């Protein structure tokens, strides 16, 4: 080997040694930096994982402007969204804990989930205490979809659960858009931010938590790593306790009840049927991520525990918690007034005149007879109800309802009926002559979908 070659090799060896020393210094510096940054400055231990950072990105992109818009719309909406933000912060803390910890016992997971239950219950309470608010649809959109938070205990497919909750929200956000599109851009932006947050959350879950909340098999003890949420939780409400038992992702309602159902453990899965658009049955009165919409609804309306209400509040007639009352009559109402019937059982409501709109929410074995409605008649989260139209109504909407009989007069045969996530629906129309019996027609519940070209073609299938 020549002297020149040896010199060249020594030069290369020296260069390699220099590079190795630089790498060693870099690593040492990085470790020190990491150690420093891991010092708890805000209650969290350890560096945040990519999933935590991405979750925060969703919050920054959608929830931050959503909060500002909520406060701008109305105090009650702002207050409710404050509780929503606290719940989201608690969920972020749980995701962070999961990224650093092994999957805990059910008892420990129960403690980790408690803040979500508490804040979700507050969201529902704010809605229930503001039923006369002009922003009731906004309050309901959040309250009825708050169950999206329970995806952290849904297995093996939490993504669809969030999609179901989004469907529940859209039942109300669509009303908001119908009323305010082109009139109030703040309302439109409010809807856009919330719905898009839920859509992006579903994508986020599919990417980072495909089969359930991802825990770190090499992590530490979840109990010791649990950070306290930035906002202290309010006094624990009388809401059902959250359960740590993972639930299947089928259809799940809202959170307070969502976690209430989860607390049943294995019993929950026996009636598995989450709430989604397809089951918006998030009957958040039955907000449980695994309970069948119909089942939960019934459970909640069976025994109203509050004082009965029958009063005109502004332009809205509120009829609530009536039991075995067959003599509820609204005589000569104003056409600008609306009628809201909530959690009534085995009762009859008569409306003698024209009103703007009618809503039955969470009622059981309740009937309503009315003459004319300018806008619509809506049935949500009900069981075994009857609607009789003696005059006219443009549309009837049925959502998350089990058992609905609709009696149409000759003047109302052009009424459009829209149904979703409902069953046992029948329409009775007059016969060919006055002496003929009513003709009963069943609203289809089963559909067949096929791909034609690049589009889906759906048609109802006849019942056997």
UniProtKB/Swiss-Prot annotation:
Topological type in the membrane: Peripheral membrane protein
Domain C-CAP/cofactor C-like: 304-443
Keywords linked to the UniProt accession: Actin-binding, Cell membrane, Membrane
Gene3D superfamilies: 2.160.20.70, Adenylate cyclase-associated CAP, N-terminal domain (1.25.40.330)
InterPro entries: Adenylate_cyclase-assoc_CAP (IPR001837), Adenylate_cyclase-assoc_CAP_C (IPR013912), Adenylate_cyclase-assoc_CAP_N (IPR013992), C-CAP_CF_C-like (IPR017901), CAP/MinC_C (IPR016098), CAP_C_sf (IPR036223), CAP_CS_C (IPR028417), CAP_CS_N (IPR018106)
Localization terms from the record: Cell membrane
Low complexity bias spans: 224-247
Biological process terms in GO annotation: actin filament organization; aggregation involved in sorocarp development; cAMP-mediated signaling; cell-cell adhesion; contractile vacuole organization; establishment or maintenance of cell polarity; mitotic cytokinesis; pinocytosis
Pfam families assigned to the protein according to its UniProt record, in alphabetical order: CAP_C, CAP_N, CAP_N-CM
Disordered: annotated span: 215-249
Highest taxon of source: Eukaryota
Main subcellular localisation: membrane
GO molecular function, one term: adenylate cyclase binding
Record keyword Coiled coil present: no
Cellular component GO terms, alphabetical: cell cortex; cytoplasm; extracellular matrix; macropinosome; phagocytic cup; phagocytic vesicle membrane; pseudopodium; vacuolar membrane
Family: Belongs to the CAP family.
Domain comment (free text): The C-terminus is responsible for sequestering G-actin. The N-terminus is required for the PIP2 modulation of cap function.
Role, per record: May have a regulatory bifunctional role. Binds G-actin and PIP2. Involved in microfilament reorganization near the plasma membrane in a PIP2-regulated manner.
Protein name, per record: Adenylyl cyclase-associated protein
Gene: cap
């Amino acid at each position: 080997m020549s002297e020149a070659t040896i010199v060249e090799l020594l030069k290369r060896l020296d260069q390699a040694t220099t590079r190795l020393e630089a790498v060693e210094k870099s690593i040492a510096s990085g470790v020190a930096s990491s150690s420093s940054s891991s010092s708890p400055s805000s209650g969290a231990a350890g560096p945040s994982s990519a999933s935590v950072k991405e979750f925060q990105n969703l919050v920054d992109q959608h929830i931050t402007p959503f909060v500002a818009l909520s406060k701008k719309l109305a105090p009650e909406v702002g207050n409710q969204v404050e509780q929503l933000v606290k719940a989201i912060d608690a969920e972020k803390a749980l995701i962070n804990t999961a990224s650093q910890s092994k999957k805990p016992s059910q008892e420990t997971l129960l403690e980790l989930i408690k803040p979500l239950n508490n804040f979700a219950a507050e969201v529902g309470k704010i809605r229930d205490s503001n039923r006369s608010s002009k922003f009731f649809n906004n309050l309901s959109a959040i309250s009825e979809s708050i169950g999206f938070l329970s995806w952290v205990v849904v297995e093996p497919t939490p993504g669809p659960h969030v999609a179901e909750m989004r469907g529940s929200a859209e039942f109300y956000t669509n009303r908001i858009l119908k009323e305010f599109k082109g009139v109030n851009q703040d309302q439109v932006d409010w809807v856009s931010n919330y719905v898009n947050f839920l859509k992006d959350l579903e994508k986020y879950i599919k990417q980072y938590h495909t089969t359930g909340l991802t825990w770190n098999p090499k992590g530490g003890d979840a109990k010791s790593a649990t950070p306290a949420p930035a906002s202290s939780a309010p006094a624990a409400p009388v809401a059902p306790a959250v359960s740590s038992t993972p639930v299947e992702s089928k259809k799940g309602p809202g959170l307070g009840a969502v976690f209430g159902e989860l607390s049943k453990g294995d019993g929950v899965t026996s009636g598995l049927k989450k709430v989604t658009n397809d089951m918006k049955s998030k009957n958040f009165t039955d907000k449980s991520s695994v309970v069948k919409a119909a089942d939960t609804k019934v459970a909640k309306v069976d025994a109203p525990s509050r004082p009965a209400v029958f009063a005109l509040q502004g332009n809205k007639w509120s009829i609530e918690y009536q039991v075995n009352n067959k003599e509820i009559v609204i005589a000569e109402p104003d056409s600008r007034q609306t009628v809201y019937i909530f959690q009534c059982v085995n009762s009859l409501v008569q409306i003698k005149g024209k009103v703007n709109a009618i809503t039955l929410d969470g009622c059981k074995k309740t009937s309503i007879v009315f003459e004319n409605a300018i806008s619509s008649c809506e049935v949500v989260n009900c069981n075994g109800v009857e609607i009789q139209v003696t005059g006219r109504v443009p549309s009837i909407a049925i959502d998350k309802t089990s058992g609905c009989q609709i009696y149409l007069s000759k003047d109302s045969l052009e009424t459009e009926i829209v149904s979703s996530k409902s069953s046992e629906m029948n329409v009775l129309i007059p016969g060919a002559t006055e002496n003929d019996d009513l003709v009963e027609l069943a609203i289809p519940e089963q559909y067949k979908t096929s791909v034609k070209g690049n589009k889906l073609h759906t048609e109802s299938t006849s019942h056997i």
